[in-house]
Amino acid sequence: MKFNYHIIILLLLIVRLFTPSTAKASQNYINNLYPSDNDEFETLMEKIRKDFAQNPLIDEFLHKYDTAKGCFTDVDYSRRDRTNWEPLTHIDRLYDFAFAYTNPQNTYYQNEDIYNKIVKGLEYWYERNPNCNNWWYNQIAEPQKIGILLIQMRVGKKQIPAELETKTLQRIRKEGGDPAKWTGANRTDIALHWIYRSCLEKNEADLETALANAYSPIEYTVKEGFQHDNSYFQHGVQLYIGGYGDEILKGTTQVAMYTQGTKYALSTEKIQLLSKFMRQTYYQAIRGKYMLFDVLGRGISRKDITDKSATALFAERMAVLDPEHIEEYKAIIARLKDEQAADYKLKPLHTHYFRGDYTLHVRPGYTFDVRTVSTRTMRCEYGNGENLKTYFMSDGCTNIVTQGNEYTNIFPAWNWRRIPGTTAPQLDTIPMAASDWQTRGTSTFAGGVSDSIYGVSAYAYMDNYAGVNTGAKKAWFFFDNEVVCLGSGINSTSYAPVYTTINQCLLDDKNILLSQNKQQTTIKKGEFSYDSPDWVLHNGIGYIFPQGGRIFLCNQQQTGSWYDINHTESKEMQQREVFTLGFNHGTNPRNTTYAYIIAPGITSARQMNAYNKKNGIEILANTDAMQIVRNKKLNIWQMVFYREGTFTHKDICLLYT
């Protein structure tokens, strides 16, 4: 008999101008902004001014300016905080003053008093020379802003006195860092202010050095930067598609736009690398305008961090730099700007990032991902007092999104013991990893396989750190209309009950439906426990329990503060209406299992029942030795073997040794 089966087997895993109205702009401004000579430095500065041009409102800040001293009365210049560094406010305001002074449409255009405030303010800053305990402010944020300010003032009616500009630039050169000593996004960010300084000084040697360093991170590496699997690492072998991924795209596309059409233009090969990462990874991890929370690193603990609408700028730049893919960028921009729905022009895609221990599954109707950690990668960090409850996020956490906003700003009210996808003891205190910056995983079995459309991922771990004392074998089987999630070998000696959380997201206004013994019930607010329900339906996503289990469901308000997870944020209490669903494995489970199916795009009990009858999913094994799922409709088999074993089903026999 001839069999035509599509088999996916996982055996062992080793492995981002103002153009003022010309009718209103003065001819002097035009002549200054667009010099007639062919000076490359001036060309670059024209583009930089165009990139940052604005028409700011500055009246509020003027009332806080001490004219005699050149400082602001509401700024404590002695602060050295590692985050939200207060003294930088001084430079931010002078920056706005500079754009107000040079913009013909601004009330303070060519205003002598504003000019004097800018000069006096720069003198004050130079003499005071505030310093932050976080190098990033000293070597990136401050010198970048000052460089742009000085470039903008070059087109002012009066320019910054030469002596003041020179000594300011000399200090930036001395104290602003060397890009060659850094990697990835940090290198590009430092190179940016080297570009600004080099243009102001007309220093070709430093400009070439700056551009070489700005471009050098655009290559594949096994260290920090773009990985061969098309993911991105920063702070060691740590997944950072968002966060530092934002920064590297902001900086590299920015520089590439400056140099386009000049002898310093970015090479075709590097543009292609950026294009691949942006189209196939970065923007795929954004649903609508919201990025998946588990690729943001410690940034997850910052308010509004998942909203990536501002990154439309990166795609707009790439539409110019990479016109071959302009239609893809147009679709990305339309989704980010809410001009089209979250599913607009999305195509089926399945990627397992073997370097990053990360899986991304995209369908027009939904996006689902899995983040794991192994001895090859680092757990999600919690440095600078941020992301303080992140511990379990690296242990098989999942995002389930259709619109993209399902988790928007939920995080202060999250129960961080119940991160979606994870199996974890409900400890009184959430552990903090051994290191705040880089803690390597312990699993030697984490990874997946993909044919670019379908795939399977698995994660086996035993965590004995800080009283967690819990392990499991977890697998995810990815198809078109569903994701099948299996767990086996769940063991724990922790004092706390062990839960597998299926989802914890914002509660939708519509009803939650539950079916038990084929009887449907509308769930009210509260906490509930069920023995082997058929399914639960919430916000257009169905959750099916083909092998039963003790299910907990919470449908209620949760509270917390941003400060709880990020000590740079507000202590004001936040309330969120939250939906939580999962398995209660009890205390000290021994070789326990779970099985659930995620079925997005279902909106009614009738559709749920119809799906259950015709989904074609067979769970053929869910043991500590193997997990096997067959999709009869697609004629796809997906298998995970954790150790030696034999699988037999009808005429199929597979032996793994």
Task: Report each predicted region and the residues it spans.
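Alpha-helix boundary/N-cap detector
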Residues: 28, 32, 36-39, 43, ...
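N-terminal functional module detector in eukaryotic proteins
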Residues: 27-31, 35, 117, 487-491
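Low-complexity, Ser/Thr/Pro/Gly-enriched N-terminal "stalk/linker" regions
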Residues: 25-88
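Aromatic-lined, polymer-binding surfaces characteristic
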Residues: 62-302
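Extended polysaccharide-engagement surfaces of secreted carbohydrate-active enzymes
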Residues: 255-655
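Short N-terminal helix-initiation segments at or just after the protein's N-terminus
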Residues: 31-42, 82-91, 131-138, 193, ...
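Bacterial Sec-dependent N-terminal signal peptides
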Residues: 1-27
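Short amphipathic alpha-helical segments that mediate assembly, nucleic-acid/protein binding
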Residues: 26-27, 41, 58, 162-165, ...
